UniProtKB/Swiss-Prot annotation:
One Pfam family hit: PsbN
Compartment annotation: Plastid, Chloroplast thylakoid membrane
Function: May play a role in photosystem I and II biogenesis.
GO biological process, one term: photosynthesis
Protein's UniProt name: Protein PsbN
Annotated family: Belongs to the PsbN family.
Record's bilayer topology term: Single-pass membrane protein
Domain of life: Eukaryota
HAMAP family in the cross-refs: PSII_PsbN (MF_00293)
Transmembrane segments: 7-29
GO cellular component terms listed in the entry, alphabetical order: chloroplast thylakoid membrane
Keyword annotations: Chloroplast, Membrane, Plastid, Thylakoid, Transmembrane, Transmembrane helix
Length: 43
């Protein structure tokens, strides 16, 4: 394979992994431990 193809596959995989991890963190089981600053601030 050419170097450019390998770099494109690597960068695409990295971005997909970061996106998957952030969605899992936001909506997965760990999301119950996240604090919500809007709920903490009552007017």
């Amino acid at each position: 394979m050419e170097t450019a193809t390998i770099i494109v596959i690597f960068v695409s995989s990295l971005l997909l992994g970061i996106t998957t991890y952030s969605v899992y963190t936001a909506f997965g089981p760990a999301s119950k431990n996240l604090r919500d600053p809007f709920e903490e601030h009552e007017d």
